[in-house]
């Protein structure tokens, strides 16, 4: 990724100015340089969503969502930039007219081939020809499923809070926000631009943080007995100790966490960033573990606030944050994030 960024190629404008090692062209370049025989022998390189539709139908079409957001396809111009691939060291892909990474780029929901092929149908126990649609990246599917509530997509930020987190902000025009991926055309809401941020570790950062504490084993046993995950057990415990969710911050007074165990995805775009815990004492009990959990949630909230502020500085305003994902369902989590960001957080109902 650093080698690619050193080129300063104009395509990088559409990934926030710096490409992330989480994206696919740095990964393919690594493969070429470190496992050249695999690179040379590979017939196709797929994002997961596209692999699944190919595996199911034999159709080699790629989703405009996957290739725009992770592969540097320029959807607003309906093309790959051959000069970019040649400059970064992947000239073969351009010379082959991009046959290995996608020549037919289509919208999510487009029917694939003739539906399920015989092999896939047998493996899944479904009829041959069952319709299969072109897919999306998981977080973007979560975004499209939530961002249209209330006053519509351009007024909401979708926040998919799971193991990692993704922020999805929809605009009518292209907005270039340094350190925030995009703008991507028609990658989530058709006909609109998408700015994508997030945190490389979110729910996973909380899990990592809690694992360091001496009381973690005891807490896990109690959570297991209660039949809930440890973070849920801690959140429930917090609510028994305060009059309202917003007051939970008092439990973590003097304790501060920057939970960037996997770097900063946005808006700093720094994969080398590290986590920080400040304010630790000699405490080893469940109350201190609870305080550490609250401080970690606040740290996640401050990281989300950084993204909102960076986008606001470039003219993007979000009236609401529409949250989805398993880590964002507890009322304590939603309230602490709302307080940190100064923006209302809403959650859609599932049926």
Roles of regions detected by a PLM:
Residues 66:
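Dinucleotide-binding Rossmann-like beta1-alpha1 core, especially the glycine-rich loop
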Residues 2-62, 70-97, 106-351:
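Active-site core segments that coordinate phosphate-bearing ligands/cofactors
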